[in-house]
Amino acid sequence: MANDVYASLGKDRKRFLNWQWRVIAVTMIGYAVFYFVRKNMSVAMPGITAEYGVTNKSFGWIIFAGSLVYGFSRFINGYLVDRVKGRIVMAAGLLLCALSNFLFGYGANLSALFTGVNEGPDFVNMFIMLMGVTIILNQYFQGFGYPPCARILPHWIHPSQLATKMSVWNCSHSIGAALAVVACGYIMGTMGTDMSQADGVVNTIIKNLTANGVDQAQAVEQAATYAAHIGAWKW
C-alpha cells in the first residue's frame, strides 16, 4: 500500500476505484460509438461509386474538407467543454452524429426530390453536394467526442497512472472502427435489392467502375456483386 496513490481515500478507496473504471468504460463505449458512426461512411463509398458513379476525387475532396472541419471542431469544442458539462456535449454530439448518418442514407432520395430526376448529371451533382454536407456535418459533430473525455478522465485518474489508463482507454478508437467495418461489411454483403439480373443496372455499374479507374475485367467481375445489393449503403 506504500505506493498506492489512492491510499489517502481510506474506506472510500474501493468505491472510488469502482467508479473510476466505470467512468473509463462508459467514456470508452461512448467514444467507440463516435468512431462507429464515423467509419461506417467509408465502407459505403464503394457501393455509392458503383451505383452512382461518384468518383474517388469527389470523395477525396469531401474527406479533405471534413478532416479540416473535424480539427476545427475539436478546437472549438475544447473551449466549449470547459464551460459546459462534458457529458451533455458528448451526448449531444452522439445524437447529432446519428442524425447526420440518417440524412446520409436519404441522400439519393433527397437528390431526386430536389432535382425531379433519379439519374443523370444534375441528380449526381446534387447527390454529391448533399453527401458532402452530411459527411462534413458528421465530422464537425465528431469533434464533440474527445474534448469531454479529455476533461473528465484526468479528474478520475491520478497523474502517475494517467498514461497507462489512457492507453487502455485509447483502445476505444480501434474497437469502434473494427465494429464499423464488421457490421457495415456484413450489411453491404447481405442487404439491399437484388438487381443482378437487370442488364441495364449491371451495365451502368460496369460503366461507373471503369470510369473510376477499375480495370474492365475487374469491373465486369464486381458488377454482379454490387448489383445484388443495390441500396445496401443506405443502411
Question: What is each stretch, according to the model?
Answer:
Residues 169-235:
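Helix-loop-helix hairpin linking two adjacent transmembrane segments in secondary transporters
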Residues 134-171:
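Cytoplasmic helix-loop-helix junction between adjacent transmembrane helices
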Residues 39, 67-75, 177-178:
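Residue-level signature of mid-helix packing/kink "hotspots" within the transmembrane helices
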Residues 95-124:
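C-terminal ends and interior cores of transmembrane alpha-helices
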Residues 22-56:
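Extracytoplasmic
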